[in-house]
Curated annotation (Swiss-Prot):
A GO term for molecular function: argininosuccinate synthase activity
Residues bound to L-aspartate: 121, 125-126
EC number(s) stated in the UniProt entry for this protein: 6.3.4.5
Binding site for ATP: 10-18, 38, 119
Gene3D superfamilies: Argininosuccinate synthetase, chain A, domain 2, HUPs, Single helix bin
The protein's name in its UniProt record: Argininosuccinate synthase
Binding site for L-citrulline: 89, 125, 129, 177, 186, 262, 274
Reaction(s) catalysed by this chain's protein: L-citrulline + L-aspartate + ATP = 2-(N(omega)-L-arginino)succinate + AMP + diphosphate + H(+)
Similarity section: Belongs to the argininosuccinate synthase family. Type 1 subfamily.
GO CC aspect terms: cytoplasm
Keywords, ordered alphabetically: Amino-acid biosynthesis, Arginine biosynthesis, ATP-binding, Cytoplasm, Ligase, Nucleotide-binding
Chief place where the protein resides: cytoplasm
Length: 401
C-alpha cells in the first residue's frame, strides 16, 4: 500500500519537484499526483511549467495567480511591521511560503487529496515553513517530503529523472540556486558558499551595479495611508503596480542588494544574496513616517516587536497564535501612519530628505523651534529634571553612607 492515494505537489518546474512526480508514484506507491504552481510575479512563463509537470507524469497540472494576495495580504503587512530578519533581510522569499501552503491545502480539499507534498530538502528553511503552515491549516493532511528522504545528490537526482524519461535541466551548468518572486530574488550555492568570495555581477537581475547606476540623483515621494504605500510621485497605484514601480525606481539606482550570513531555522549559518529593491525602499520610507506620527513609547515598543514578528515569519510561524497577536498590535498602530516621505536615490543609497503628515504628525514646530516662535516652557524643565533625577540622587546618597 502506498503512502497516499492522491497527492497535491507544490511544483516549481525545477529538478527536485519534477523528479518528485515519478518518485512519488514509483517509489512510494502514490496513485495520482496533481501539481500546483504559484504565479507570484516571478516573470516565468507558466504554460511550459504546466506542460512539464504533465510530461513528468502528473494527472493534472494546475497554475494559480497569487500575485495580488501575495502583495496585499503578505507583503503589505510586512511593510507595516518593518519586517527585517536579523535587521537586514525583508523576508521576500519567506513571505511567499505561507500563501503557497494555504493554496496547496485549498487545492487538496477541492480535488479530494489525502496528502500534499513539496520538494524541499532537509537543510533549508522552506521545509519548516511548508510543514508547519500545513499543520496549522490542515492537521489531518499528510505531508510527503521525498526530497528530504531520498538521499540523492543533485547529480543523482538528475540521473534518476533522466531514467524516468525527464529531459536534463537546461540550467544543469548553473551553480546557483535561485528563488524569485515579485518582491525579490534570493541566490545561494556554488561559488557563493565561500563567504570571502565577492558575488559576481551575473547573480543580480533586478538591480544595476553601483558603477552602472546613474551619476545623477533622483528624488521621489512615497505616500502612505494607514501604513500602506498608496502612491509614488503623486500617482496612485494599485498594490501590485506600486511594488513594480518601487522595484524599477530602486533597482535602477542600485538599491536593494544584500550579501549576508544568516542563521537558518535548522541551526546552521548560510550565505545568501538577496535583491529586494522595492521592498527595502518602502520599508525605509515607512519607518521614517512612523518616526513622525507614532508616540515615542509606541514607537519603541513597536521596534522591539518588529524583530519578533520578522523572526516568526522567517521561522514558518505565520499562522501561529503569537503572530496573530502581534498582527493586532501592528494594525492598531497603523491608523496614524498617514503622510508622504521624500527620498533621494543615488548610487545604491536612498536618503530621506523630507517627511510630512497633514493630519497625523506629532512634530509641533512651535515646541521644537529655538527661534522667536518657541512656545516650550523652559522654566518647567527645572522641576521635571529634579523629579526625573531623584532616583539617581537617592541611589548616589545611599552609596556614600
Amino acid at each position: 500500500m502506498g503512502r497516499a492515494k492522491k497527492v497535491v505537489l507544490a511544483y516549481s518546474g525545477g529538478v527536485d519537484t519534477s523528479v518528485c512526480i515519478p518518485y512519488l508514484k514509483q517509489e512510494w506507491g502514490v496513485e495520482e499526483v496533481i501539481t500546483f504552481a504559484a504565479d507570484l510575479g516571478q516573470g516565468d512563463e507558466l504554460e511550459p511549467i504546466r506542460r512539464k509537470a504533465l510530461e513528468a507524469g502528473a494527472s493534472q497540472s494546475l497554475v494559480g495567480d497569487l500575485i495580488q494576495p501575495f502583495i496585499e495580504e503578505f507583503a503589505f503587512p510586512a511593510i507595516r511591521a518593518n519586517a527585517l530578519y536579523e535587521g537586514r533581510y525583508p523576508l521576500s522569499t519567506a513571505l511567499a511560503r505561507p500563501l503557497i501552503a494555504r493554496r496547496l491545502v485549498e487545492v487538496a480539499r477541492e480535488v479530494g487529496a489525502d496528502a500534499v507534498a513539496h520538494g524541499c530538502t532537509g537543510k533549508g528553511n522552506d521545509q519548516v515553513r511548508f510543514d508547519v503552515a500545513i499543520a496549522a491549516l490542515a492537521p489531518d493532511l499528510k505531508v510527503l517530503t521525498p526530497a528530504r528522504e531520498w538521499g540523492m545528490s543533485r547529480e543523482e537526482t538528475i540521473a534518476y529523472g533522466e531514467r524516468c524519461g525527464l529531459p536534463a535541466p537546461v540550467s544543469k551548468k548553473s551553480p546557483y540556486s535561485i528563488d524569485l518572486n515579485l518582491l525579490g530574488r534570493s541566490v545561494e550555492a556554488g561559488p557563493l558558499e565561500d563567504p570571502m568570495q565577492a558575488p559576481p555581477e551575473e547573480v543580480f537581475a533586478m538591480t544595476v551595479s553601483i558603477d552602472a547606476a546613474p551619476s545623477e540623483a533622483e528624488e521621489i515621494e512615497i505616500a502612505f495611508e494607514a501604513g500602506n504605500p498608496v502612491s509614488i510621485n503623486g500617482q496612485r497605484l494599485d498594490p501590485v503596480a506600486l511594488i513594480r514601480e518601487a522595484n524599477r525606481l530602486a533597482g535602477s539606482h542600485g538599491i536593494g542588494r544584500l550579501d549576508m550570513i544568516e542563521n537558518r531555522v535548522v541551526g546552521i549559518k548560510s550565505r545568501e544574496i538577496y535583491e529586494t529593491p522595492g521592498l527595502l525602499l518602502l520599508i525605509q520610507a515607512h519607518q521614517e513616517l512612523e518616526s513622525l506620527t507614532l508616540a515615542a513609547d509606541v514607537l519603541r515598543t513597536k521596534r522591539q516587536l518588529e524583530m519578533q514578528w520578522a523572526d516568526l515569519v522567517y521561522q514558518g510561524l505565520w499562522f501561529g497564535p503569537l503572530k496573530e497577536a502581534l498582527d493586532g498590535f501592528m494594525d492598531r498602530t497603523q491608523s496614524e501612519v498617514n503622510g508622504v516621505v521624500r527620498l533621494r536615490l543615488h548610487k545604491g543609497n536612498a536618503i530621506v530628505t523630507g517627511r510630512g503628515s497633514s493630519d497625523s504628525s506629532l512634530y509641533v514646530p512651535e515646541m521644537a523651534s529655538y527661534g522667536s516662535e518657541d512656545q516650550f516652557d523652559h522654566r518647567a524643565a527645572e522641576g521635571f529634571i529634579y523629579v526625573w533625577g531623584l532616583p539617581i540622587r537617592l541611589w548616589s546618597a545611599a552609596r556614600r553612607r
